[in-house]
């Protein structure tokens, strides 16, 4: 799986469009896997760090954080904003790495 920086280098136009969707609104929808394997959806904030990472923010003991510590796979759906979907839609999936 590519890092955000690798994605941006390989597909600059697409990564710019996705980044625009993710920075247009503060809150997005994160899907994680519960202990029993069923999906959990949660609101989350997304930040692009200075060193080119896509960071998913969470309180340390939030269920989404616990899910990601156990199974780091996730899907993220950008907030579509206004009902006209100006700017398109963005969905991505990946593997989270805990930052301490």
Q: Where do the language-model regions lie?
A:
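Short active-site oxyanion
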Residues: 51-55
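A short, Trp-centered hydrophobic/proline-enriched beta-strand micro-motif
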Residues: 22-34, 75-78
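Short, acidic, Ser/Thr-enriched surface-loop or helix-capping motifs
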Residues: 34-36, 49
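Extreme N-terminal tail/first-helix region
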Residues: 1-27
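A short, well-structured catalytic beta-strand-centered motif of the EAL phosphodiesterase domain
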Residues: 43-48
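Short, structured beta-strand-loop surface elements
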Residues: 4-5, 60-100
């Amino acid at each position: 799986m590519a890092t955000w920086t690798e994605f941006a280098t390989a597909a600059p136009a697409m990564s710019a469009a996705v980044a625009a969707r993710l920075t247009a609104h503060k809150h997005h929808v994160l899907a994680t896997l519960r202990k029993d394997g069923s999906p959990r959806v949660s609101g989350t904030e997304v930040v692009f760090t200075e060193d080119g990472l896509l960071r998913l923010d969470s309180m340390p003991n939030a269920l989404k954080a616990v899910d990601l510590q156990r199974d780091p796979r996730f899907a993220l759906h950008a907030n579509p904003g206004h009902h006209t979907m100006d700017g398109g839609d963005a969905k991505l999936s990946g593997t989270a790495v805990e930052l301490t």
